[in-house]
Curated annotation (Swiss-Prot):
Residue span(s) of domain N-acetyltransferase: 299-445
Pathway noted in the entry: Amino-acid biosynthesis; L-arginine biosynthesis; N(2)-acetyl-L-ornithine from L-glutamate: step 1/4
Protein name stated in the entry: Amino-acid acetyltransferase
Localization per Swiss-Prot or TrEMBL: Cytoplasm
GO BP terms: L-arginine biosynthetic process
PROSITE patterns hit by this protein: GNAT
Family of this protein: Belongs to the acetyltransferase family. ArgA subfamily.
GO molecular function: L-glutamate N-acetyltransferase activity
Amino acid sequence: MKIRSTALVKGFRQSAPYVNAHRGKTMVVMLGGEAIADKNFPNIISDIALLHSLGVKVVLVHGARPQINQILEKNQRDTPYHKGVRITDESSLGLVMQAAGQLQHAITARLSMSLNNTPMAGTQLNVVSGNFIISQPLGIDEGVDYCHSGRIRRIDVEGINRMLDLGSIVLLGPIASSVTGECFNLLSEEVATQVAIKLKADKLIGFCPQQGIIDTKGNAIAELFPSDVERLVKSMEQECAPDDEECFSTMRFLRAALKACRAGVPRSHLVSYKEDGALIQELFSFDGIGTQIVMASAEQIRQATIDDIGGIFDLIRPLEEQGILVRRSREQLEQEIHKFTIIDKDGLVIGCSALYPYPEERMAEMACVAIHPEYRDGHRGLHLLVHSKHQAKQMGIRHLFVLTTHSTHWFREQGFNEVDVEALPMAKKSLYNYQRRSKILMLQL
């Protein structure tokens, strides 16, 4: 008899909301030369192919910095830098184009693979490259001629979208042509950023050696706002050693993400190119695995609507089955939905509570407090309590009370005091379930 893996089934079920959310969305994936050189590169390509098979429109922008350095060193060519940009002269341009071209063909070959017993089995991807980017020279700055180092002049947005709509993966590199028929070496971060902005992409995704941005305790920072990124970049500018390419690579992505975020790209993600499956875990799991840069938090506390009933029902049902919450039918939820507040994360209901006012006694009950098991370490229950207190005060409520069988100590920590049944409003007192023997706790507002 075959052993069935419940973990696999659970993973599929948990990822389903994200599969639906990402389908049809445009994501610009920035794959640096460091990621391509890593042994995990084949797995990253498989994950990008998986994104495509799940209905995501993928634009893949690759860099070639370490490969260019390697081929220049091999041919004893030295290219100086000015303000962090490589000066690509006539003699080194051919080598730069060679390195970038080899990577483009290597990526295309990987995406074209469909061998049995591999993650790419059965895939038939169309990978499209072309003159979607028109470049121009950077020119001369402070007397320094950038030669064949350039910047973007325009992007063929219509052409890229047409290829995406036809089901192709669009592959862009750091070499682009100009209207004069010349080739210029561009910063891949700038290509990815401008493409994401012009396409109005839903996400910009980059790779780094670590699991995103790591804090002083060694933990990945799940979410950063633009102001956080600005401070972080300034700190890295002072602390990065001149030869620390990993630090500079991460800093370049943060600058790109900051620019993209402020130009309207909702989210940018930074994940590890060393960790197998990091891209999939970041996009298709509850908490992700890397760092995302957002204009506004992915979580928000808001008034529940009729569309949230399914999410609330799924959240509270396990607690009802355990006897922690009083059972509520779907019909009751529909009738009382205006009394509910939820915590919404990417369209998922991860927390809820309800507020039942008794205006004559100037009292209100906070009930049906539930937090998703994956999110019980983030003080979300406290956030719901603060929100309920604010709502109650606006209604002119003087006392907020709860009935609980399991969370007495937590509510006492928040300032609630235990009272007897007689302290309840008359209407609630008549409905008190003596068999359930819930503790009654009250807070003066």
